[in-house]
UniProtKB/Swiss-Prot annotation:
Protein species of origin: Tachyglossus aculeatus aculeatus
Alphabetical UniProt keywords: Calcium, Disulfide bond, Glycoprotein, Lactose biosynthesis, Metal-binding, Milk protein, Secreted
Entry-linked Pfam families: Lys (PF00062)
Major subcellular site: secreted
Annotated SMART domains: LYZ1
Known partners and oligomeric status: Lactose synthase (LS) is a heterodimer of a catalytic component, beta1,4-galactosyltransferase (beta4Gal-T1) and a regulatory component, alpha-lactalbumin (LA).
MF terms in GO: lysozyme activity; metal ion binding
Protein's GO biological process: defense response to Gram-negative bacterium; defense response to Gram-positive bacterium; lactose biosynthetic process
PROSITE patterns: GLYCOSYL_HYDROL_F22_1, GLYCOSYL_HYDROL_F22_2
GO CC term (a single one): extracellular region
Keyword Metal-binding: yes
InterPro entries associated with the record: Glyco_hydro_22, Glyco_hydro_22_CS, Glyco_hydro_22_lys, Lysozyme-like_dom_sf
The protein's name in its UniProt record: Alpha-lactalbumin
Subcellular location as annotated: Secreted
Length: 126
């Protein structure tokens, strides 16, 4: 599903992501746009691993699934199938995002954040 900006904003807010670990809703909307174009089914390959869903969560560390381009086992820290990160239900994606924020390198885990989502966030407001 490709979400509309404000539809996604409402869902992220309803699931407690606004202000979580100090990250604003506008930053999350910006990240989702630059990572996946708001597409919950996005699948990309980079550096021999796959990234999944709205937030492009990486298989190597966070989810479990077969990856044709990598034989390395997944850590599966979010205890979720990568396929579940590419469906229309993003509540489980948000739980994984929160885990990444708390247990990993925080918001810098998302490469889109620093170059695109620190300043001038007005376009991401609803």
């Amino acid at each position: 599903k490709v979400f509309e900006k404000c539809e996604l904003s409402q869902m992220l807010k309803a699931n407690g992501l606004d202000g979580f670990q100090g990250i604003t809703l506008e930053e999350w909307i910006c990240i989702a746009f630059h990572e996946s174009g708001f597409d919950s089914r996005a699948l990309n390959y980079y550096n021999g691993s796959s990234s999944h869903g709205l937030f492009q969560i990486n298989r190597q560390y966070w989810c479990d699934g077969q990856d044709a381009k990598s034989t390395e086992p997944s850590v599966n820290a979010c205890q979720i199938s990568c396929d579940k990160l590419r469906d229309d239900d993003i509540e489980d994606d948000i739980k994984c995002v929160k885990k990444i924020l708390k247990e990993s390198q925080g918001i810098t885990a998302w490469e889109a954040w620093q170059p695109f989502c620190i300043a001038d966030l007005d376009q991401w407001k609803c």
